[in-house]
Every structure is written in structure tokens, then in C-alpha cells.
Amino acid sequence: MGRKKIALIGAGNIGGTLALLAAQKELGDVVLFDVVEGVPQGKALDLSQVGPIAGFDAKISGSNDYADIAGADVIIVTAGVARKPGMSRDDLLGINLKVMKAVGEGIKANAPDAFVICITNPLDAMVWALREFSGLPHSKVVGMAGVLDSARFSHFIADEFDVSVKDVNTFVLGGHGDTMVPVVRYSTVNGIPVPDLVKMGLSSQDKIDAIVKRTRGGGGEIVALLGTGSAFYAPAASGIAMAEAYLGDQKRILPCAAYVDGQYGVDGLYVGVPVMIGAGGVEKIVEIELDDADKAGLQVSVDAVKELLEACKKLDPSLA
């Protein structure tokens, strides 16, 4: 059996990092696609020359032709404009919607059997639009949001309690933006819920509330510090974790922007929920019990996503 094929749409910072991680983990051969001539080819050549040093045999190629993604097992989409300081994810809507149309049509024509992971912002709207334009089953198109947001939450929690990140499990629901819902009571340190650790006097509610707020603004904090560009190492690592779950049929429970149809009282849109990812793609949506505060927070997030979808439909009537 031949190697798996990973197609990366967008050869920017996230795309390049995805290519390196996929090759290092030997997930398969990598095709790095971009509309800018020379960029994917140059990055692919540079990355290929890491192989003799890092010891991987994965082939990495660059292309400007969607035909070269044909037969891809996994496609990770990062194409589009990145956030700039002062720009919200939603400001990106008009520009990146057009990009998703081109990408969706390219996937539909060349790799209709792939498992597609969208990273382009504003995430919850872009993954929905990409699914609409590509026509793929909802179970085979998912957005990378909660894995990254939970990683940020976990990092801050590990710092607060001065413990290994390996012992921290956190959980973020809702849209990938300021309305996300970090669920503190389902977040644990080696199985001990964070609220219990607060009761033990190991932290304070004020500090945990500040961590929740910082998690919500995690992407913006990095954008402001960088001055130009946005986060790319952790987003790429998050996308690779999702790809590994699919390729290895790992049945991992990961928070992702998945198509929700009745669960959590939500109908017909993509929003961050815990899902099982295996060889069938999104195999199950895990519906956990939420308290009133988390339910209210999720509803605010859902309403924000709905507004974005309505804006998408106005910008491109074919989506209506």
C-alpha cells in the first residue's frame, strides 16, 4: 500500500509548518498548494532538504495547479488573508469567502473523497462555506478551532497551577472568536476538576476568570505582539492532531467546528463541539450536559456564527 497523501491549500506560515510536521510524523507525502507562483515550490524544496537531517522519507512538492491535489486523503485549508492588528476575524469575511469558493471548487473537482480540515478565519463561517462550495459530506469537512483554543486554555492552566501540560485537559465550546466558551468545570488537572482545585486554595476564581478571558483573546494577543501576521505554530500542530486522528482511526474526542444538526439545541451550522474523529471523519458529536451559564454562553456564540452566515449569504447569493 502506498503512502497517504496530504494536500495543504495555502503555503503561508501555517501551511509551511503543517508540511514540516506532517513530514516529520511521516503522515504521508505532502503537496503544498498556493496561487502564488514559486512560493509553494520554493518552500517544498526547502522542506524536502530537512529530510536528510530529520530522517524522514516523505515527499514534499509544491504546486499552483489544483489537479495536483487529486486523490488526497487529507486536505488542510489555510488559504486566505491573515489577521492584522486591530482587525477582527469577521473583518476577513468578504476576502476569504471568495478564497473558499475557489478552494471548494478545486476540492470538488479533484479530491471529493478527502477529509477536509479548515483553518481559515473567520473559522465557523469559512468551514460552512467551504462545505457548501465543495459539496462534500458534512462528516468529511471540519474546522480547526477548539483544539487550538483548548491548547491555549491548557497552557494557561498549567502555568497557573505550575503542573505539566500533560496532566491538563481543558475544554472549549462555541465559535472560534471572542464568544468562545471555555468550560471550566469540564477542565481538569490529572482528573481533578479545576473548580475543586480552586476550593482547595490552589488558585482563585478571579485568576481562573482571567485565564478564561485570556483564552478568548488568545489569538488577538499574539497578533498584537507580532505586529504583522498571526499565530501559526500552534494552529498547525492542532490541524495535524486532527489529521492524525483521521488517518490513524484514533477515535479521539476533540473539540472541533463540526456540523451540528439538533445537538445542543443547534440546527444546521458549524460550531465548536466535542466530536469523535476516526476513519469515517466526524463519527459522532458528543453531547455533554451544560449548566445554565455555559448554555447561555454557547447560545451567544451560536448567534454570532448565525450572523456571519447571513453576511456570507448576502455576499454570495449562491449560498442562500
UniProtKB/Swiss-Prot annotation:
EC number(s) given by UniProt: 1.1.1.37
Keyword line: NAD, Oxidoreductase, Tricarboxylic acid cycle
Any Pfam family the entry gives: Ldh_1_N
One of the GO BP terms on file: tricarboxylic acid cycle
UniProt-listed SUPFAM superfamilies: LDH C-terminal domain-like, NAD(P)-binding Rossmann-fold domains
Keyword Endoplasmic reticulum: no
Chain sites annotated for binding NAD(+): 10-15, 34, 96, 119-121
Binding residues for substrate: 83, 89, 121, 152
Molecular function in Gene Ontology: L-lactate dehydrogenase activity; L-malate dehydrogenase (NAD+) activity
Active site: 176 (proton acceptor)
Entry-linked InterPro entries: L-lactate/malate_DH (IPR001557), Lactate/malate_DH_C (IPR022383), Lactate/malate_DH_N (IPR001236), Lactate_DH/Glyco_Ohase_4_C (IPR015955), Malate_DH_type3 (IPR011275), NAD(P)-bd_dom_sf (IPR036291)
Reaction(s) this enzyme catalyzes, per UniProt: (S)-malate + NAD(+) = oxaloacetate + NADH + H(+)
Annotated function: Catalyzes the reversible oxidation of malate to oxaloacetate.
PANTHER family in UniProt: L-2-HYDROXYCARBOXYLATE DEHYDROGENASE (NAD(P)(+)), L-LACTATE DEHYDROGENASE
Family to which this protein belongs: Belongs to the LDH/MDH superfamily. MDH type 3 family.
Name this protein carries in UniProt: Malate dehydrogenase
Organism: Sphingopyxis alaskensis (strain DSM 13593 / LMG 18877 / RB2256)
Gene (name only): mdh
